[in-house]
Amino acid sequence: MKEKIRLYDDKGQIKGISGSVVTSSCPVNTTIYEVAYVGNEGLLGEVVRVRKNFADIQVYEDTTGLRIGDRVIFTGELLSIKLGPGLLGQVLDGIGRPLGKLGESSPYISKGTHRDAIGGESWSFEPYLNKGDRVGPGDILGEVTEKSFSHRIMVPLKIGAGKCEMTWIAPAGNYSSDDVVCEIDGQAIKLHQKWNVRVPRNVEKKLDLDRPLITGTRVLDVFYPLALGGTAVIPGGFGTGKTVTQQSIARWANADIVIYIGCGERGNEMTEVLEEFPKLKDVRKDAPLMDRMILIANTSNMPVAAREASIYLGMTIAEYYRDMGYDVAIIADSISRWAEALREISGRLEAMP
């Protein structure tokens, strides 16, 4: 982490601390939603407001121990996540850190810990195209077999609009997520992509909702049918079965991939999900259900600011698989606690909720 901080020259100092919101002096070119590393431990945060030479930063980790005068590093980048083979079956926290991998070294997440969800594994890449072919953003270059899924390697958005010539593509073989597998117009393409969590995917037009989402729960499919590409809310008071219904949909829905976001959920309920889901079988493929799921665990005892990011993180991952042509179900439990987090952050900023 210390080596990463040395790469940046834009620094500030902490001027005020209010819970998860830190006020810092900042460079002139600081922008909204820019990533900042706060304090000597490099706590991850995002700029949420800029006022003249000061920036308000929502910190995604515990701010206990921060002091007035501690340094703040402004990176000039937006919050992003590495997307590629190896995501399926993982359990992430609200800012995309792999809890399973972090748990191998300690039962607790140390402050200032930053680790990508993918990396270090080798994957068998099978190219679809040849040298000299012209490709554009979203075109499929090849595939990697991930569990029971075909993980399609796509041309990233950074290539820009229009078709460009592919000057080189790797032969079939094993590659890590950081290996270059293609060169397009002089730009190196790796097995993984980095997507900004806050930036929505470009959409040309919205498609009609003409296909049903079969939830596997008869009372919903008969009396409250859902559509692929649609949205639904399960309202209700405490203990009325909202979480149980959502978990049932996650198990039995006819979506190809399920992103389950535990946003501010009680720790015991999220523990139940983490214990039960790995034991369940996918009846369609006779494989573990977790092979087509990604769990985002951001319980109520985790930092409030990370609840907001967890929803955007889940949507970003879902859009990535959606672009491959898969039907993806996003289940967020619960939106009300996400709204509570937004209200608390607004209160810390002394702004309207």
Which residues fall in each region the model found?
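N-terminal accessory targeting/assembly segments
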Residues: 1-103, 107-110
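Conserved, well-folded catalytic cores of nucleic-acid-processing
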Residues: 17-20, 39, 50, 63, ...
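Short alpha-helix capping/helix-loop boundary micro-motifs
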Residues: 20-25, 55-61, 120-130, 165-170, ...
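Short, well-ordered loop/turn sites that connect or cap secondary structure elements
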Residues: 28-31, 66, 129, 135, ...
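Short, compositionally biased
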Residues: 49-55, 85-96, 148-173, 189-205
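P-loop NTPase nucleotide-binding/switch module
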Residues: 102-146, 152-158, 176-231, 245-248, ...
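The Walker A (P-loop) glycine that initiates the GxxxxGKT/S ATP-binding motif of P-loop NTPases
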Residues: 236-237
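Conserved P-loop NTPase nucleotide-binding/switch module
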Residues: 240-257, 262-263, 267-269, 276, ...
